[in-house]
Amino acid sequence: MCLLKLPVVLIILSVALNHLKATPIKSHQMEKRKCNTATCATQRLANFLVRTSNNLGAILSPTNVGSNTYGKRNTIEILNRGPLNYLPL
């Protein structure tokens, strides 16, 4: 008898939920919660680093990312180089 009442209750509940209207909330808090976890974590980390760098000063020197930095490979050298055999087969 209880098993027959369960589908009826579920149908009534689903109909009731479909008739409810969600009221939009206009708040800054809700806008902040829309971002996904990775974006929020990245933004929080960036904000934390900006705040702490003002207090502690620069711990590491800035990274040189220009076109003449050490480690930039010349494509001609890469093409002329032979295959690398690290492991004997």
From Swiss-Prot:
Q: Does the keyword Secreted apply?
A: yes
Signal sequence coordinates: 1-22
What cellular component GO annotations does this protein have?
extracellular space; neuronal cell body
Which cysteines does the record link by disulfide bonds? C35-C40
Q: Name one GO molecular function term.
A: identical protein binding
Propeptide ranges are 23-31, 74-89
* Alphabetically ordered keywords of this record: Amidation, Amyloid, Cleavage on pair of basic residues, Disulfide bond, Hormone, Secreted, Signal
List residues modified as Tyrosine amide. Y70
User: A GO biological process this protein is involved in?
Assistant: positive regulation of cAMP/PKA signal transduction
Q: Where in the cell is it found?
A: Secreted
Instruction: Please indicate if the UniProt record lists RNA-binding as a keyword.
Output: no
Q: Which family does it belong to?
A: Belongs to the calcitonin family.
Assembly behavior: Can form homodimers. Interacts with IDE and INS. Interaction with INS inhibits homodimerization and fibril formation.
Domain remark in the UniProt entry: The mature protein is largely unstructured in the absence of a cognate ligand.
> What's this chain's function?
Amylin/IAPP is a glucoregulatory peptide hormone that plays an important role in the regulation of energy homeostasis. Selectively inhibits insulin-stimulated glucose utilization and glycogen deposition in muscle, while not affecting adipocyte glucose metabolism. IAPP function is mediated by the CALCR-RAMPs (AMYRs) receptor complexes. Amylin can also bind CALCR receptor in the absence of RAMPs, although it is more selective for AMYRs.
Query: What's the protein name?
Result: Islet amyloid polypeptide
Q: Which organism is it from?
A: Canis lupus familiaris
